[in-house]
Amino acid sequence: MRRNRGFTLVELIVVVVILGILAATALPRFINLGSSARTAAIQGLGGSVSSALNLVAAMTGVSGTGTPGEQIDITWITIGGTPMRIWNGYPDRWCDGIGVSQQGFTAPGGGCYLSAAAVPYGNFTFYGYGNGQIPGGDAGWRIESAPDPAQCSVQYTYNGSGTPVVTVNTSGC
């Protein structure tokens, strides 16, 4: 009597088809993980920037270095040993203002006042006001590896007389 070894051609084709269906079902989920990670990172950064904005406004009010909403000259406060440029009671729109509000961010040597230059910060890049990289030319951060970096960003819109607005853009992540 002859012993059969292995699989028949029909069994092999059935297994390959089943594996193909499973792969086609699971692949979109794995591809979307990068987008989800970028979206979560931008949303987390937006929350951090909003918290820093409120903290700095409270600190400037308490320390007497400027009352939010009151027009004053540029001044400085120190948070965790890092000097921060303040205007009108809020972080200014340059990398040595709102940029240094994020732990671990280091402003370039010589400062960056009136500079829209890109400053890398972890997975993000910070751009000062007038940069053309963040919608409206506002200051902010973006993820350069996103499909549309300008729409995977955190905007810091500084309106000279009121509370700056933090906008999180995730449509391009």
Would you name each region that the model predicts?
Residues 2-5, 29, 38, 85, ...:
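Arginine residue identity/basic-tract feature
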Residues 1-34, 41:
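N-terminal single-pass transmembrane signal-anchor helix
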Residues 15-17, 49, 55, 164:
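Short, contiguous, well-ordered secondary-structure segments
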Residues 62-173:
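Periplasmic/extracellular, small/polar-rich flexible segments of pilin-like filament-forming proteins
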Residues 37-64:
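Membrane-proximal N-terminal amphipathic helix
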